[in-house]
């Protein structure tokens, strides 16, 4: 692998691969040669710093890393999460073909379908008004209490699919900061509110702290006997859920082969199903399944998740770019960059190989972004003229949902395409000076100002286009990026499905709580932590 990467570096230098502007000038068919499609989903990577020899080298890299074999092992249900000794089968949750999927010799598809049907019945009862609160009033507000994968996925998808909401209002509480739950409770009528507590173990400290506050809210307003009428849970810890006061009929489980950041397809997606209905949730699953089938069957050079992963690895380890910007030109995808941030950085932010050795490559990049056009008036300055090159990933729908605002969607499209073109083409010093003098500026001043208006160009980007953001399109888009993360993890030779980096801080926080509460001494902690605790305790008096 190391030799193949070094060969790619040499090829990039020899072929001037990073001169994207020259590549377009030399090849009028570059777009058609470096783009591919799955139905209405178009993937354009022609503005990336690639050429035929680079793609050849990346394909060889994929074969050397056994990407296809590792992919097949995942779909087969092999134990690929080696540190936790688990299969990785979020794909089984959206297996619309009902093709058997075996875990320890058992076909899990019937169990998946049974949970999906139970979710559908419950969602229907909430949406229709048949499920009522303790005082007989129908539910108007649903609050999901979770964190990490139990929050980001439902939040992101619920916002993204707002045009399909025909159920009760949705709210999401994640942060242990009491302000989050307090601000949410102010919006609610206890009699018409339903809380969904999403925690597989029912022990997640942030989630259970917020759940206890919500429980006290219901009990305080309606009495202790009302609690069971206003709560449901997504968990496998039936004993703890029962002790909390939630009836087993309102508990929806999922499996240890579903990681939190991949769990939107599971019962964690219950709030989304309540918002958009089980038929639309089914279309969401259909979209994910369609990308799964493409990922499984398409040749490497037409395989969109594989190409996306190879380009990501190439940008990181051949060209040395440390981050990537996720730029959806869709306001309803406002949380999609944050969702991908968790998906990518929690999966591939690792430093140890599958053989328990230090990795030989730079692993996951920093993933960040905001919707366009907002970002254009914030951080695009750095992307265009900063000293670091940041590959950009644009996404845009051909059609918006607001038919009477078609002119605004056209303006949105124009901005999206203009940004990718500007990143590639840039503006030379001569062009900048000519523009200034054409507006009447004298030569001396133009010579001074023009360097500030130079854009180097040759800044890589890719663009994903789809017809319209609907449940199918969103499911397909999420699955595309899930598989991209898988491909990059296979190239890094790491386990993309554990998250031990989350644990140390949690352990230390548990030990620090009695210190912060003033019940124990800070002795034994470093001087910075000791000093900070003292300052905070003094200020809080």
Swiss-Prot record:
EC numbers: 5.3.1.9
Pathway(s) it belongs to: Carbohydrate biosynthesis; gluconeogenesis; Carbohydrate degradation; glycolysis; D-glyceraldehyde 3-phosphate and glycerone phosphate from D-glucose: step 2/4
Gene Ontology biological process terms, A to Z: gluconeogenesis; glucose 6-phosphate metabolic process; glycolytic process
Catalytic-site annotation from UniProt: 346 (proton donor), 377, 506
Keyword Nucleotide-binding: no
Keyword Magnesium: no
Subcellular location: Cytoplasm
GO cellular component: cytosol
Class in the EC hierarchy, top level: isomerase
Entry superkingdom: Bacteria
Catalytic activity: alpha-D-glucose 6-phosphate = beta-D-fructose 6-phosphate
Gene Ontology MF annotations: carbohydrate derivative binding; glucose-6-phosphate isomerase activity; monosaccharide binding
Swiss-Prot/TrEMBL keywords: Cytoplasm, Gluconeogenesis, Glycolysis, Isomerase
Family: Belongs to the GPI family.
Functional description taken from the UniProt entry: Catalyzes the reversible isomerization of glucose-6-phosphate to fructose-6-phosphate.
Name this protein carries in UniProt: Glucose-6-phosphate isomerase
């Amino acid at each position: 692998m190391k030799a193949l990467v070094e060969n790619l570096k040499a090829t990039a230098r020899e072929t001037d691969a990073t001169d994207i502007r020259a590549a377009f000038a030399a090849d009028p068919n570059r777009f058609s040669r470096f783009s591919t499609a799955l139905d209405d989903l178009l993937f354009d990577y022609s503005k990336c710093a690639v050429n035929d020899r680079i793609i050849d080298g990346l394909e060889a890299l994929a074969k050397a890393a056994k990407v296809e074999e590792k992919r097949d092992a995942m779909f087969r249900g092999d134990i690929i999460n080696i540190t936790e000794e688990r299969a990785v089968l979020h794909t089984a949750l959206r297996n619309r073909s009902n093709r058997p999927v075996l875990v320890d010799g058992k076909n899990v598809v019937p169990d998946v379908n049974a949970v999906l049907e139970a979710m559908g019945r419950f969602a229907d009862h909430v949406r229709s008004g048949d499920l009522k609160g303790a005082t007989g009033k129908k539910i108007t507000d649903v609050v999901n209490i979770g964190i990490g994968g139990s929050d980001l996925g439902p939040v992101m998808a619920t916002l993204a699919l707002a045009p399909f909401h025909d159920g009760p209002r949705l709210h999401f509480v994640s942060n242990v900061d009491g302000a989050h739950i307090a601000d949410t409770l102010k919006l609610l009528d206890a009699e018409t509110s339903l809380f969904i507590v999403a925690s597989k173990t029912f022990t997640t400290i942030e989630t259970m702290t917020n759940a206890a506050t919500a429980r006290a809210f219901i009990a305080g307003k309606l009495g202790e006997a009302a609690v069971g009428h206003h709560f449901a849970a997504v968990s496998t810890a039936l004993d703890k859920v029962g002790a909390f006061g939630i009836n087993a009929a309102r508990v929806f489980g999922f499996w240890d082969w579903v990681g939190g950041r991949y769990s939107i397809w599971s019962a964690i997606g219950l709030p989304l199903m309540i918002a958009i209905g089980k038929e639309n949730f089914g279309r969401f699953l259909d979209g994910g399944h369609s990308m799964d089938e493409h990922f499984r069957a398409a040749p490497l050079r037409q395989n969109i998740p594989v190409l996306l992963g190879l380009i990501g690895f190439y940008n990181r380890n051949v060209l040395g770019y440390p981050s990537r910007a996720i730029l959806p030109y869709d306001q309803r995808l406002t949380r999609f960059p944050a969702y991908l941030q968790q998906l990518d950085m929690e999966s591939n932010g690792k430093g140890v190989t599958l053989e328990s050795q230090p990795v030989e490559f730079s692993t996951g990049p920093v993933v960040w972004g905001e919707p366009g056009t907002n970002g254009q008036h914030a951080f695009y300055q750095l992307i265009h003229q900063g000293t670091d090159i940041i590959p950009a990933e644009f996404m845009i729908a051909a059609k918006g949902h607001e038919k009477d605002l078609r002119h605004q969607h056209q303006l949105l499209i124009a901005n999206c395409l203009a940004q990718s073109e500007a990143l590639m083409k840039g503006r030379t010093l001569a062009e900048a000076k000519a523009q200034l003098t054409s507006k009447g500026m004298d030569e001396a001043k133009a010579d001074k100002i023009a360097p500030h208006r130079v854009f180097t160009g040759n800044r890589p980007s890719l663009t994903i286009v789809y017809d319209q953001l609907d449940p199918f399109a969103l499911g397909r888009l999420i699955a595309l990026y899930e598989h991209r993360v898988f491909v990059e993890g296979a190239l890094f030779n790491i386990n993309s499905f554990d998250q031990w980096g989350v644990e140390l801080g949690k352990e230390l926080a548990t030990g620090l709580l009695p210190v912060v509460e003033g019940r124990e001494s800070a002795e034994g902690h470093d001087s910075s932590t000791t000093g900070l605790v003292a300052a905070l305790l003094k200020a809080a008096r």
